[in-house]
A protein has these predicted regions:
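N-terminal subdomain of nucleotide-sugar transferases
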Residues: 212-259, 263-268
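Phosphate-bearing ligand-interacting subdomains
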Residues: 271-273
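Active-site region of glycoside hydrolase catalytic domains
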Residues: 1-211
Length: 273
C-alpha cells in the first residue's frame, strides 16, 4: 500500500474527522459504493473521547521499489507467550499518532501481556516478564503524556486469566492466576506491583526512579552492543548536545562534563554523579 497510516484512519477518520482518508478512497474507488453527505452526517457524530487497543507494532521501511515493506526482527527479539513482539516504542508512537491526528482525549482500552505463568513451589506466581512489560509500556505512555498527549486513562488486559478468543484457556493475560480445574485464584506478583503503580500514580515506574544507575560504557562497546540510539530511546540517558544519546563517562564523552537530561539525574553534570 502507498500509505499504511489509514490502516486505522480508514475506520477512525470518518467518525472523528468527517471524511475517509484519500489514500483509501483512491485505492478502492472501483469497489466503493457512493458515499453521500447524509452518510457522513450520520457517521460523524459528536464524541467525547477515543478508545484504542494497542499491543504491539512492526518495523517498516521503504523497499527498493519505493513501496513499504516489513523489516524482519533480529533473533532473540522479546516476545510474549502468544508470540507477539514486545514493542513499547509502538505504544509510544501509537499514542502520539492518535492524539495528534484526532483532537479528542484518548483512553487505552486494552494493553497487556500473555505469559507462561506457573505456580511456584512457594505457592505464588512470579510473573516478572509481565512486570517488565508493563513497566516499559506504561513508561512509554507517561513519556507521550509528558510531551503533551491528551491521554486520560489506561485499562490493563486483564484482571483474571480467562478464555482468550480462539486460543481458549492457553493464553494467560491476567494479573490473577486461575486454576481452571479447581477455580482457585492466586494473586500474581504483577498485581501487587500494579497496585503500587496506582497507589503512587506511576511513581514506582523505573523511568521515575532517581536511583537509576547511570551506564558508563566504552564508546566502541556502546555502538557494537547497544546500537547507535538504543541508550537514548530505551533508557533515556541523554547528554546535552549529544545527538547519539550515549553516556560514556567523563573521560570518554566527546562533550566532556556534559549535563544529563531526561533521566532520574536530570540537570546534573557527569562530574556530580
Amino acid at each position: 500500500m502507498n500509505n499504511w497510516t489509514w490502516n486505522i484512519s480508514w475506520f477512525s477518520d470518518p467518525v472523528f474527522l468527517g471524511h475517509y482518508p484519500k489514500e483509501g478512497l483512491e485505492k478502492f474507488k472501483e469497489y466503493l459504493p457512493e458515499i453521500t453527505e447524509a452518510d457522513m452526517q450520520l457517521i460523524h457524530q459528536p464524541l467525547d473521547f477515543m478508545g484504542q487497543n494497542i499491543y504491539n507494532g512492526y518495523y517498516v521501511r521503504q523497499g527498493a521499489d519505493g513501496e513499504p515493506e516489513f523489516v524482519d526482527r533480529e533473533p532473540g527479539f522479546p516476545k510474549t507467550a502468544c508470540n507477539w513482539p514486545v514493542t513499547p516504542k509502538a505504544f509510544y508512537y501509537g499514542i502520539k499518532f492518535l492524539t495528534e491526528r484526532y483532537p479528542l482525549p484518548l483512553y487505552i482500552t486494552e494493553n497487556g501481556m500473555s505469559c507462561h505463568d506457573n505456580v511456584s513451589f512457594d505457592g505464588r506466581v512470579h510473573d516478572n516478564d509481565r512486570i517488565t512489560f508493563l513497566d516499559s509500556y506504561i513508561g512509554a505512555m507517561q513519556r507521550a503524556y509528558d510531551e503533551g498527549a491528551d491521554i486520560r486513562g489506561y485499562f490493563l488486559w486483564t484482571f483474571l486469566d480467562n478464555f482468550e478468543w480462539s486460543e481458549g484457556y492457553r493464553e494467560r493475560f491476567g494479573m490473577i492466576y486461575v486454576d481452571f480445574m479447581t477455580q482457585r485464584r492466586i494473586v500474581k506478583d504483577s498485581a501487587f506491583w500494579y497496585q503500587d503503580v496506582i497507589g503512587t500514580n506511576g511513581g514506582n515506574l523505573s523511568m521515575n526512579q532517581t536511583t537509576k544507575e547511570i551506564l558508563f560504557l566504552d564508546p566502541v562497546c556502546t555502538h557494537n552492543i547497544w546500537g547507535g540510539t538504543r541508550l537514548r530511546e530505551d533508557f533515556h540517558y541523554l547528554v546535552e548536545g549529544d545527538d547519539l544519546g550515549e553516556c560514556w563517562g567523563i573521560s570518554a564523552h566527546p562533550n566532556g562534563d556534559g549535563t544529563l537530561r531526561d533521566c532520574g539525574f536530570r540537570g546534573m553534570k557527569l562530574s556530580e554523579l
